[in-house]
Amino acid sequence: MSDRRRLIALCLALCFSFICASPASTKDAERYRAVPANADGIGKAYMDRQIAHVMSFQGAAWLERNEREREERSDLLLGILSLASGSSVADVGAGTGYYARRFADLVGPTGTVYAVDVQPEMVAVLQAAAKRRGYEHIKPVLGTVRDITLPAGSVDVAIMVDVYHELEFPYEVLQSVVHSLKPGGRVVFVEYRAEDPRVPIKRLHKMSEAQIRLEAEQHALEWERTANELPWQHVVIFKRK
């Protein structure tokens, strides 16, 4: 092949790759940036916050540890949430279903708890636990790293307990959460307080209220209130506009 033909072929290949470039990959480049990775972070930042490593299904036992109730005071969280009987709740990043089961007790058999996770192994664990305990109104859902895969307008309240800071695509996931909300539905972030140095959690696994609000307000969400009654976490609540 002559040099001229090689040049033409190269130009055509470049043009083709440009035309066929994924809109998602273009948006990713605009929305996220690479940063030095470390033991706790994935080397990717969103709004100047490095995203933390996700907890593997191999750490499932830690989610069911005996100390969790004392450390997190789930009883106080449930009081803050005040989930109504018959409500439809999305537990995003449900893990083993530790909170999904508690939400299910509040909404009762006429309600629904969508227990969403991206790890098939974790979904299998929570499904087995729900079946063993007789929670027929807990519906395990396998989501993706970009989408919780719930129907539009199907959820009254979406709750993320120590989850949002680990999302590989936080913008896209939160957009799908908002899409799933009924009019006036709520999104609840429960995160370890980055403002408090006494909270014994690694830095990338904590979030400040200001950072949560900054990221949430990129969507059709309006801050409603923040509750600080929990020992280590804050509960930041938004309402769909």
Residue ranges of each PLM-predicted region?
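Class I SAM-dependent transferase core
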Residues: 27-90
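Conserved class I S-adenosyl-L-methionine
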Residues: 186-213
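Conserved SAM/SAH-binding beta-strand->alpha-helix loop
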Residues: 119-120
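A short glycine-rich, Lys/Arg-flanked "PGG" loop and its adjoining helix->strand segment in the class I
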Residues: 104-105, 171-186
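Hydrophobic beta-strand segment of the Class I
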Residues: 89, 158-159
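Core SAM-dependent methyltransferase catalytic element
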Residues: 223-241
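A short acidic, Gly/Pro-enriched loop at the edge of an enzyme's catalytic core
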Residues: 146-157
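Conserved SAM-binding strand-loop segment of SAM-dependent methyltransferases
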Residues: 133-146
